[in-house]
C-alpha cells in the first residue's frame, strides 16, 4: 500500500534515475573504458558499480510502482484513523504532542514525521477516533496517547 503522494515520489525518483543518472553514469563508464587498461582504472570500476546500483534501484522502483496499491482518501475514512492519515496525538503524562502520518515502508525514507503502518504506534492508532486514548507498547516502555486530530490529504 502507498499514498498517492508516495507513488508520485517513487515515479519521480524512477524518472530521474532513468533519464538523468543512468545516462550520465553510462557516459562515465564509456569514457573510463576508452582510457585503456581497465584493471587499475578506479573511475571505470566505481562507475560500473554505480551503474549496477542504479539498475538495482530502478528494478526495485518498477516493481513497487507496478505492485503497490494506491490508497487514496475517501469520505468514509473521515473521523477514523486509517492508512495515510495525519494524526495529532498527545502524551498527557509528558505534555508531549506529535503529528504523524501512517504510511507504508517505502514512504518512510527521509520523512521523520511518517511512521510505518506496521509499527506499534500505528497499530494502536488504526480505526480509532478523536478523543480515544491508546496504549502503545514498545520494547522499552508503555505509553498512553490521546488522539487530538485526524486529517487526510485530499
Predicted regions span which residues?
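Generic detector of short, locally flexible boundary/turn motifs and exposed helical patches
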Residues: 9-11, 17, 50-56, 65-67, ...
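Non-DNA-binding regulatory cores of transcription-related proteins
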Residues: 71-151
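Short amphipathic alpha-helical segments, especially helix-boundary/capping motifs
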Residues: 2-7, 61-63, 107
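Conserved, well-folded catalytic cores of nucleic-acid-processing
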Residues: 17-20, 32, 61-71, 124, ...
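Internal alpha/beta loop-helix hairpins
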Residues: 42-75, 79
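N-terminal cationic and glycine-rich segments that engage phosphates or anionic surfaces
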Residues: 1-56
Amino acid at each position: 500500500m502507498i499514498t498517492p503522494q508516495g507513488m508520485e515520489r517513487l515515479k519521480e525518483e524512477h524518472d530521474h534515475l532513468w533519464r538523468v543518472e543512468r545516462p550520465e553514469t553510462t557516459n562515465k563508464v564509456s569514457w573510463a573504458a576508452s582510457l585503456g587498461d581497465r584493471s587499475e582504472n578506479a573511475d571505470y570500476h566505481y562507475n560500473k558499480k554505480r551503474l549496477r546500483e542504479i539498475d538495482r534501484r530502478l528494478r526495485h522502483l518498477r516493481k513497487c510502482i507496478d505492485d503497490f496499491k494506491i490508497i487514496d482518501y475517501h469520505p468514509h475514512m473521515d473521523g477514523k484513523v486509517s492508512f495515510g492519515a495525519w494524526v495529532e496525538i498527545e502524551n498527557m503524562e509528558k505534555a508531549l504532542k506529535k503529528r504523524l502520518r501512517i504510511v507504508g515502508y517505502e514512504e518512510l525514507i527521509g520523512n521523520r514525521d511518517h511512521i510505518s503502518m506496521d509499527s506499534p504506534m500505528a497499530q494502536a492508532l488504526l480505526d480509532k477516533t478523536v478523543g480515544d486514548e491508546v496504549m502503545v507498547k514498545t520494547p522499552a516502555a508503555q505509553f498512553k496517547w490521546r488522539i487530538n486530530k485526524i486529517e487526510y490529504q485530499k
